[in-house]
Amino acid sequence: MNINATLIGQAIWFALFIWITMKYVWPPLQKAMADRQAQIAEGLAAAERGKHEQELAAKRSADALREAKEKSADFVAQAEKRAQQIVEEAKGTAKIEADKVVAGAKAEIEQEVERAKQQLRERVAELAVAGAEKILRKEINASAHADMLAALKQDL
């Protein structure tokens, strides 16, 4: 093969082409690739941050859910405790009312018993006077002998 002027001219033009490409074309291409690489790195970092934030959000939501469950359990326990207190208060009030009713009934029964005893005493006194009158065959004056009849009632 002969090395002639065409080959030398082509080599010179090729060297000039490489120099122009390295001087004017290559730096913007390198800058574009570096920018793209930085964008990709930022995207990956953002994805990593997003994943981390998602994990934190999941943890916060689990904590909030647990806390809500604890609060609801506390509310239920407080409600049950309050309901038990209300039941106990109602039982106490009912017992007091029942005791009052029983005491009132006992007092009323005692009054009725005393009234019946009083009526019975009066009736016994009348029967005693009637019996004594029949025995003596004379009339005993109830107003004249009121002291004696009162003493008889007391004895009975």
Curated annotation (Swiss-Prot):
<dbReference type="GO" id="GO:0005886">
    <property type="term" value="C:plasma membrane"/>
</dbReference>
<dbReference type="Pfam" id="PF00430">
    <property type="entry name" value="ATP-synt_B"/>
</dbReference>
<comment type="similarity">
    <text>Belongs to the ATPase B chain family.</text>
</comment>
<keyword id="KW-0813">Transport</keyword>
<keyword id="KW-0375">Hydrogen ion transport</keyword>
<keyword id="KW-0138">CF(0)</keyword>
<keyword id="KW-0472">Membrane</keyword>
<dbReference type="GO" id="GO:0046933">
    <property type="term" value="F:proton-transporting ATP synthase activity, rotational mechanism"/>
</dbReference>
<dbReference type="InterPro" id="IPR002146">
    <property type="entry name" value="ATP_synth_b/b'su_bac/chlpt"/>
</dbReference>
<dbReference type="GO" id="GO:0046961">
    <property type="term" value="F:proton-transporting ATPase activity, rotational mechanism"/>
</dbReference>
<keyword id="KW-0406">Ion transport</keyword>
<keyword id="KW-1003">Cell membrane</keyword>
<dbReference type="InterPro" id="IPR005864">
    <property type="entry name" value="ATP_synth_F0_bsu_bac"/>
</dbReference>
<dbReference type="InterPro" id="IPR050059">
    <property type="entry name" value="ATP_synthase_B_chain"/>
</dbReference>
<keyword id="KW-0812">Transmembrane</keyword>
<keyword id="KW-1133">Transmembrane helix</keyword>
<keyword id="KW-0066">ATP synthesis</keyword>
<keyword id="KW-0997">Cell inner membrane</keyword>
<feature type="transmembrane region" description="Helical">
    <location>
        <begin position="7"/>
        <end position="26"/>
    </location>
</feature>
<dbReference type="GO" id="GO:0045259">
    <property type="term" value="C:proton-transporting ATP synthase complex"/>
</dbReference>
<comment type="function">
    <text>Component of the F(0) channel, it forms part of the peripheral stalk, linking F(1) to F(0).</text>
</comment>
<dbReference type="InterPro" id="IPR028987">
    <property type="entry name" value="ATP_synth_B-like_membr_sf"/>
</dbReference>
<comment type="function">
    <text>F(1)F(0) ATP synthase produces ATP from ADP in the presence of a proton or sodium gradient. F-type ATPases consist of two structural domains, F(1) containing the extramembraneous catalytic core and F(0) containing the membrane proton channel, linked together by a central stalk and a peripheral stalk. During catalysis, ATP synthesis in the catalytic domain of F(1) is coupled via a rotary mechanism of the central stalk subunits to proton translocation.</text>
</comment>
<protein>
    <recommendedName>
        <fullName>ATP synthase subunit b</fullName>
    </recommendedName>
</protein>
<comment type="subunit">
    <text>F-type ATPases have 2 components, F(1) - the catalytic core - and F(0) - the membrane proton channel. F(1) has five subunits: alpha(3), beta(3), gamma(1), delta(1), epsilon(1). F(0) has three main subunits: a(1), b(2) and c(10-14). The alpha and beta chains form an alternating ring which encloses part of the gamma chain. F(1) is attached to F(0) by a central stalk formed by the gamma and epsilon chains, while a peripheral stalk is formed by the delta and b chains.</text>
</comment>
